[in-house]
Regions:
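N-terminal hydrophobic/helix-forming segments and targeting peptides
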Residues: 1-256
Length: 256
């Protein structure tokens, strides 16, 4: 079954420490007309991730210094983070920003940084059906709020793969399924399981951004000749005529 693990904030992991846990309760902006906008409880992306708390009145020009938009996508609310700089901010569509008028605004973010917090990750290990200690590692990350492609797609396929592998009558390898916050969670997991991973894992896969309608793509391992590369390149040619094959130089997620 699913095993869940917690690492306390402040724990030494290689050359860094697990950061304080960010807790967000609410956030919004009150306009000069008294309207409440950028409500966290209506859309998580309205608050800068890892934002410091704020409760102040300020002018539009002052507020704009803390607002993030995507001008070339005028209706989109961007996903912006502040790891690990202590600053505050809001995210909104560029259309909404352009509609704001001069006057006094009230910016409110109810958040805190828990020095006694924790980082959580989980794993499921499905054993082989023959005598074999070698493993296939399959991971996905869980840390981007209210996002479909760059978040939910990975865990959704991860869950389906767990079901699929469990139902296999014959399994040559053991399967290690890991789900954790991107980057920091994976670093913690490697730190806690390094010797086991080094001695047993023969192939690894990271499920990232697999929920859009673009071409199937794969980022190869550094040597481009691992078991995971061979299996992926063999499979991908049977499901698409136009795969995107990237070298390891294009890494950007937990495959790093």
């Amino acid at each position: 079954g699913l095993e869940r693990f917690s690492i306390p904030s402040g724990t030494q992991v290689y050359d860094w420490r697990v950061p304080p846990e960010w807790v967000i309760n609410d956030g919004y902006i009150i306009t000069p007309d008294g309207d409440k906008i950028c409500e966290f409880k209506k859309h998580n992306l309205h608050i800068l991730n890892y934002s410091a708390p704020i409760n102040m009145r300020l002018s539009l020009d002052e507020l704009k210094q803390h607002i993030y938009t995507i001008p070339h996508m005028p209706t989109a609310i961007p996903y912006v983070t502040s790891y690990y700089e202590r600053r505050w901010g809001f995210c909104m569509s560029d259309e909404q920003l352009c509609s704001l008028k001069d006057g006094e605004y009230h910016a409110f973010i109810d958040s805190k940084f828990k020095e006694d917090g924790e980082l959580n990750y989980a794993q499921i290990i499905i054993p082989s059906t023959i005598k074999n200690d070698k493993e296939i590692l399959i991971s996905a990350y869980l840390c981007h709020p209210q996002m479909a492609n760059n978040e939910l797609s990975g865990p959704a396929i991860w869950c389906e793969l767990v079901k699929f592998v469990k139902n296999l009558k014959h399994r040559r390898y053991n399967y290690r399924f890991v789900i954790a916050p991107e980057t920091i969670g994976s670093i913690c997991y490697i730190n806690r399981n390094f010797e086991t991973l080094k001695s047993k894992v023969v192939a690894g896969f990271v499920l990232s951004c697999i929920g859009d309608d673009r071409d199937y793509s794969v980022v190869l391992s550094p040597d481009e000749n691992s078991l995971s590369d061979i299996a992926t390149l063999h499979t991908i040619k049977h499901i698409t005529n136009n795969p995107k094959i990237y070298p390891f130089l294009y890494r950007g997620s937990d495959e790093r």
